[in-house]
Amino acid sequence: MPTLGSPAGRDEARPMHAEAAQASPPLERLHSRARHENFPVALHVLPARYRRHLLTLYAFARMVDDIGDAASGDRLSLLDSVSAELDRLYAGGVTTDPLYQRLAYTVAVCDLPRNQLERLVEANRRDQLVHRYRTFDDLLDYCSLSADPVGRLVLRVFDADSAER
C-alpha cells in the first residue's frame, strides 16, 4: 500500500514528470468544473468522510479525460506520463503535485488497486486510436476500461467492492 512519503518541498521529494504537470489542471478549476456536471449532486447527500476521496477520484478521472480529449501535443506521451506517476505513487514515491498527493492519500486510505486507475488511462489511450467501434462487443470492451473502473473505485471508497458487485 502506498504512503504519502515526505512532505512536498523536502529534498527527497521528486517532482512529477513535466508533461503530466502541464496536463494536470489546478484542483480549483476541476472542482469548479464539477459544479457544472451531475457529479456534485451526490456529494451533497453523502457523508463527509467520502467526499474528499470522491472529489480526488473525480479530479484524477477528469484530468485523464482532459488529456485524452483536449491536450495539445502528443496525448499518448502525456498519458504515458500519467502512468509513470501512478507507478511512482504505488512505489511509495513522492510528488509535489497536489492532485497526486491527494490521490496517494485516497489510494492508501481506500486501498485502491492500481489497475483500476490505469484502466482509465488506457481508455483514453484507446480514444486516441479508435474513433468508432465496429460492434457492440467492442464498445462493451471499451466500457470495461472507462465506466467500469469508475464504478469499482467508487465501491472501494465505500468499502463495498466485492465479487458479487
Predicted feature locations:
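Acidic catalytic motifs of isoprenoid enzymes
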Residues: 2-165
